Amino acid sequence: MAEAFEGHYDREIATPNLSPATRSASDATRERTMRIGGAMFFTDYSMSPTELARALEDRGFDSLWVPEHSHIPLTRKSPFPSGGDLPKKYYDVMDPFVVLGAAAAVTKTLLLGTGICLIAQRDPIQTAKQVASIDQVSGGRFLFGVGNGWNEDEMANHGTAFANRHKLARERVEAMKAIWTESKAEYHGEFVNFEPMMAWPKPVQKPHPPIIVGGAFPYGARRALRYGNGWMPHRSRTQYADVQALLPKFREMAAEAGRDPALVPITIWGARENLDLLKRDRDDGVSRLVISLDSGKADTILPELDRWATLIRQLGS
């Protein structure tokens, strides 16, 4: 019986015909039109995930992004990257995969992204299954935004040494790629190690959902080129114009790394309600902008989305 069961999985990984929504996720690098996504820290006092997801899709946004913090320790060895006190929503944010599963159930074309998933403090085998499951449930609409994190105390509670987080994250991404793409996967690294095993389902998108690596220039950009399918810098943590200056540097770095710059899309986190600035981003080759929404209710969020919907139409996104 065990041999028969094992033989059931001893097969090629199927490559299905992808839906238009899936193609837009997998082939984002080929899109010339800049997309606009929305992000929120979902809490028990914000709009619900289903409510916001429907509102975004109805208004022409291409994607919903959700962040991750498993908890916030009361000690603080590392400062908040954006400066000042840590906002309350960081303590209260919901689980990203639960949120995206709910959003997937009420939408048809909206892409669904983690922004970002803290892979340095996550088990790669369990996370690989969550990624594959949400990609299946959504019909291939998942975007895997990943990052290594900044909160040293939060990582420590997960058993992650802050000094090792970058190499650990890389190994975990490599291990997850093996799980997604191999019928019988194994991985042997310094921090991640497992013998041949089977893990299903596999993602709808082949070889796997796009891995969009968050992080500043130059180190985050290098990680994106090393194991990612796109780069996602955070505009609020640098001067607005500085991101523009970094785009040609990133493309030069991509070419030096043997990557076609045109096939490594750039998603910028942070945008202003200004058509001229949006056009500048579009003309500079930015693939997507993600706007950060407060953890508010519909009466405050929907008017903001309506203003953005007008800009999206004017932009032609």
Predicted regions and their residues:
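Extreme N-terminal basic, low-complexity initiation segments
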Residues: 1-11
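Active-site-adjacent structural elements that line small-molecule/cofactor binding pockets in enzymes
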Residues: 6, 14-17, 23-317
